[in-house]
């Protein structure tokens, strides 16, 4: 067989089901081999969308997502999607075509230094120089992508290597690979675990901060056991949404810049903070000097580089969250059962829980607006009601784009199951929501997949309407349409003297006609009374469906200003954007005036 056929065999050996990609000249041997394979290839309309779809597939399923793009511009178009996966620790293998090995370094047609390009945004980079390397490199790539802290791995495929012959009997696909220098720690150090247990046992105001690492390790059941064993409140990061049902009485919601008041206040008042799979980003901590100043911090993370990077911790524990929590629960359970007298502090903890519950009750958000234009909170409320009415809570995946639509969902939507809320957290990539929904639906065909996006984010990858139309992928697209870059405008309004610049979409398309031009059902909703029925119609449809919600452009999110304390939550009240748009006639007038002045 040739190299390309060996690559297909290697993918099949990894039980890859689907590839998301876009072909090109440097990949023709690969696609020729793919033609003879049972592997499914989903042709996106842009390589960035292929990477986001592979990412959505990985987040929804826990499996490695695979994307592919040709050399040069195909590789550069993958970069944003791969960087998004890297920021959020999503397992991915990104394949790129490359010019023949003898032409590398000669500035050949569509040549680019793909290794240098991907190096900062992947766990590891490979370039296959000989066909005999194919089996081991592919096995190594998948091993690296899904072990330790997951993330993307890049393999560069020169065209001549795809065409050369390989004796697969002499170079079989290995079942295991030895990766020198790569040995992720999974078992927590016993001494550190004992220190953590001692701190937890002495706590009077304990709280858990659960991040994306809980979901990545599959530790949601262990987290729930720990929460209920100790009766400890829990808040999550954006990436941790879904690791515990947000309807649980001890769940406080998301913490941070756009976090809930109970989460932000309780974390700030805690005396022991148990952080699990969280990297303490600036969006979580706010002013680092005022972050959890009363608390002793226990930090559990599989990546030792994250511990102590942003926040000083008292008890660091490196390892897999699931395995560490199992051991913590085992030892705490033993202590509690052995001597209940040691639990005399329970009254103090119960007072803490009483205070937490009181804060939750006083912080219930108003969502039932009947205003026109529609308030985003009303859409979120009706979406949760429809999901309840249809009894699909455990069978629904939400993807979001980035901006106000993302934070309205993160703040107000009650996520109940793991891997059911997919969003770009670390990189904050606009354009992520729609293609990631495609990947999620392919990964979980029996689930209802609903993409929540803004008009700005949707337009960044709206060409993928062609993908869902061609393959009849029944995702529901909900556009929060305010004809504005809402989050940018909110910041300009709050922190830049209300000076509006480049935030209005005066030339946005008619999204209904755009969808219908692809043969996709679509509907515009302008009244709150239409929301419930429209959502049910779209969710029950077995075809793609686009809903365009005309939302109030003056709607804004409460937030913690950048660099402020978590308890410094401000209400954002703003007017309708009224930016003056400079039209082409004005651009031309200035050009001609400058031209005359130069004479």
From Swiss-Prot:
Key words, A-Z: Amino-acid biosynthesis, Branched-chain amino acid biosynthesis, FAD, Flavoprotein, Magnesium, Metal-binding, Thiamine pyrophosphate, Transferase
PROSITE patterns named among the record's database cross-references: TPP_ENZYMES
GO biological process terms on file: isoleucine biosynthetic process; L-valine biosynthetic process; sulfur compound biosynthetic process
Pfam families: TPP_enzyme_C, TPP_enzyme_M, TPP_enzyme_N
Cofactor note: Binds 1 Mg(2+) ion per subunit.
Origin superkingdom: Archaea
Region feature Thiamine pyrophosphate binding, mapped onto this chain: 404-484
Its EC number(s): 2.2.1.6
Cofactor: Mg(2+); thiamine diphosphate
One Gene Ontology term of the molecular function aspect: flavin adenine dinucleotide binding
This protein's record includes keyword Metal-binding: yes
Any one cellular-component term (Gene Ontology): acetolactate synthase complex
Family: Belongs to the TPP enzyme family.
Protein name: Probable acetolactate synthase large subunit
Organism: Methanococcus aeolicus
Name of the gene this protein is made from: ilvB
């Amino acid at each position: 067989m040739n190299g390309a056929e060996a690559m297909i065999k290697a993918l099949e050996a990894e039980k890859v089901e689907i590839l998301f990609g876009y072909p090109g000249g440097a990949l023709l041997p690969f696609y020729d081999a793919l033609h003879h394979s049972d592997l499914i290839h989903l042709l996106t309309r842009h390589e960035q969308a292929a990477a986001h779809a592979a990412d959505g597939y990985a987040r929804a399923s826990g499996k490695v997502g695979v994307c592919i793009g040709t050399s040069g511009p195909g590789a550069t178009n993958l970069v944003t999607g791969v960087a998004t996966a890297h920021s959020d620790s999503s397992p991915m293998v990104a394949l790129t075509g490359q010019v023949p090995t003898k032409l590398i370094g000669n500035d050949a047609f569509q040549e680019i230094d793909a290794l240098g390009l991907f190096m900062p945004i992947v766990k590891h980079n490979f370039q296959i120089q000989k066909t005999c390397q194919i089996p081991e490199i592919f096995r190594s790539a998948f091993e690296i992508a899904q072990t330790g802290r997951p993330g993307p791995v890049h393999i560069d495929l020169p065209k001549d290597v795809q065409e050369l012959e390989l004796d697969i009997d002499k170079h079989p696909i290995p079942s295991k690979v030895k990766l020198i220098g790569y040995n992720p720690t999974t078992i927590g150090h016993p001494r550190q675990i004992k220190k953590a247990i001692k701190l937890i046992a002495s706590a009077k105001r304990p709280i858990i901060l659960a991040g994306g690492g809980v979901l990545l390790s599959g530790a949601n059941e262990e987290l729930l056991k720990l929460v209920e064993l100790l009766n400890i409140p829990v808040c999550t990061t954006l990436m941790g949404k879904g690791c515990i049902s947000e309807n649980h009485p001890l769940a406080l919601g998301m913490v941070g810049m756009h976090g809930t008041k109970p989460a932000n206040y309780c974390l700030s008042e805690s005396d022991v903070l148990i952080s699990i799979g969280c990297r303490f980003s600036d969006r979580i901590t706010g002013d680092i000097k005022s972050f959890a100043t009363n608390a002793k911090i226990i930090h559990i993370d599989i990546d030792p580089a994250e511990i102590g990077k942003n926040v000083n911790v008292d008890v660091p524990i490196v390892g897999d969250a699931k395995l560490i929590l199992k051991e913590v629960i085992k030892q705490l359970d033993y202590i509690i059962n052995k001597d209940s007298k040691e639990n005399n502090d329970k009254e103090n903890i119960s007072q803490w829980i009483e205070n937490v519950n009181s804060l939750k009750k006083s912080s219930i958000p108003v969502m039932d607006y009947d205003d026109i234009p529609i308030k985003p909170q009303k859409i979120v409320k009706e979406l949760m009601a429809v999901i309840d009415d249809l009894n699909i809570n455990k069978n629904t995946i939400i993807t979001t784009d980035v901006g106000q639509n993302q934070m309205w969902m993160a703040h107000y939507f009650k996520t109940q199951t793991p891997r059911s809320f997919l969003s770009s957290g670390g990189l904050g990539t606009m354009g992520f929501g729609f293609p990631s929904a495609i990947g999620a639906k392919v990964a979980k065909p029996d689930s209802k997949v609903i993409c929540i996006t803004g008009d700005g984010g949707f337009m960044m990858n709206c060409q993928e309407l062609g993908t869902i139309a061609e393959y009849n992928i029944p995702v529901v697209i909900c556009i929060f349409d305010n004809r504005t870059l809402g989050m940018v405008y909110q910041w300009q309004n709050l922190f830049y003297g209300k000076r509006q610049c480049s935030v209005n979409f005066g030339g946005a398309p008619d999204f209904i006609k755009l969808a219908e031009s692809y043969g996709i059902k679509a509907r515009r909703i302008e009244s709150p009374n239409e929301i419930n029925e429209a959502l049910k119609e779209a969710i029950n449809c077995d075809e793609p469906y686009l809903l365009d919600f005309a939302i109030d452009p003056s709607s804004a999110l409460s937030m913690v200003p950048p660099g402020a304390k978590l308890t410094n939550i401000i209400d954002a009240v703003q007017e309708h954007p009224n930016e003056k748009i400079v039209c082409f006639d004005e651009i031309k007038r200035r050009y001609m005036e400058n031209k005359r002045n130069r004479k």
